[in-house]
Amino acid sequence: MNQYKVLIPSAGLGTRLGDFSKNLNKALVSLDNKPVISHVIEKFPKHIEIVVALGHKGDLVKDYLQMAHSDRQITCVDIENYCGNGSGLGLTILECKEYLQCPFVFCPNDTVILEEVPEPTTNWVGYAEVDNNH
């Protein structure tokens, strides 16, 4: 598969992060002295377009991306209804539909990628069971 994009949703409030995301978009929370969104972006080749869905404190993320990743093709999509009734990941992906008319890799900004991401060769979906009792 030669042409694909990467979708990084970062529209929500990040409430699971508590005070870390109160005044900051969750994508900008620092991990090893670098915003977590940079860790995600840097796992993909520079020629791959990145689509970032933004809501809560989205302007901060846009400013950061322009400064830190000016050498990348990054499309920011503003999600108006990022919290409250009708909001959610499904709506966020739907709002990005216009920019994702090709295969894409879905990569949440709160997922730490430790290995290089292989170029997708087929369509696939991955999942993992999560113990919610922690």
Question: What role is predicted for each listed range?
Answer:
Residues 1-8, 16, 30, 34-106:
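Conserved N-terminal catalytic core of the sugar/cofactor nucleotidyltransferase
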Residues 13:
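Conserved SAM/SAH-binding loop
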Residues 19-22:
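Conserved catalytic-core motifs of eukaryotic protein kinase domains, centered on the activation segment
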Residues 105-107, 125-126:
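Short hydrophobic-aromatic micro-motifs
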Residues 109-112:
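The conserved acidic donor/metal-binding loop of glycosyltransferases
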Residues 114-134:
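Conserved core of the sugar-phosphate nucleotidyltransferase
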